[in-house]
Amino acid sequence: MTLSKKIYNYLYIFFLVLIIVISEFSTNFAKAKTFVINDIEIQEKYDLNFNKIKVVDKAFKKAFEILISKILQSENKNILRSTDINQIKSFVEGFSLMEEKFVDDNYQAKINVDFNKKDLINYFNSKGIITSSINSIDVMILPILIDLKKNQIFSYSNNPFFLNWNLNNKKFHQINYFLPNEDIEDFSIIRKNIDDIENYNFNEIFNKYNVKNRILLVLLNQDNLIKVFSKLNLENNEMYLNKNYKDVSMKNLEQINDVILDLKNDYENKWKSLNEINTSIILPIRLSVDANNFLLSNNLENYLNEVDLISNY
């Protein structure tokens, strides 16, 4: 083996090791060339005006809206809702139609859509928008509702936020929640620490479930004003959130659900902030590979295509 070829091989190995090390400690790394949105349900009246291309275009639009809700902060996704269908179609890498059927003169189907990840990231970056990787996470949430007037803690079975939390899920949500079981001991721990509830960690409750990712949600209700304090611990990152909600009745399920969805969106934004793919900082690296070694070149190219942190090569 010649000296120059040895150097090329050493550089190649060094470069791959560098990428692997960076990727191992970064939430920005993803091993996929596409963003995949599955099981988009479509339905259209089947009559003389039926046009399958237009139906699929609607599915692309719907899939795109779900995607941007998954990977963009709330304030940014509204900017892109007006993206025209031709622009959206330019990002589509492929799609598959499933379960096509006709029911009562209606065409129904499910569609999976693959969007080109690098094209989308570059498009968003050109608009000054940072994307996040799609990374689902299981989180235990402990919603504690307190009536300040009565100095009363609601049991889980009487807490509308507890009862309705998992009834308000959206397809773009990446956080999968689970709640504790009704337990007299939990209630006793909460009541014991009611005077310092925003500072107490409630590890006695969380540790029973052996959970790493957790959210403490404290809701203080007085005269239809709800003061909310949230302490999030996601992948060893501690974050806090304080909000107020006015004119929320504990008897109005629609208002309760609106608060739940708003909080879930805030938690999604916090989680996305930990998974940002920031390619705005450009660090040029020169790498030489033997063009005659097709297998080596092909493997390297495939690997580079899969790394979000590499914008161009």
Regions found by a protein language model. Give the residues of each.
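Bacterial N-terminal signal peptides
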Residues: 12-24
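C-terminal/domain-edge helix-coil "capping" segments
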Residues: 53-70, 112, 119-134, 171-174, ...
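Solvent-exposed coil/turn segments that connect beta secondary-structure elements
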Residues: 40, 45, 114-120, 144-148, ...
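Short N-terminal segments immediately surrounding and downstream of signal-peptide cleavage
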Residues: 29-47
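N-terminal segment of the mature soluble domain
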Residues: 56-79, 137-198, 207-214, 300-313
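Signal peptide-directed extracytoplasmic domains
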Residues: 78-144, 151-156
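N-terminal secretory signal peptides that target proteins for export/translocation
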Residues: 1-8
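Amphipathic beta-strand/beta-sheet edge segments enriched in Tyr/Trp
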Residues: 33-39, 117, 210-255
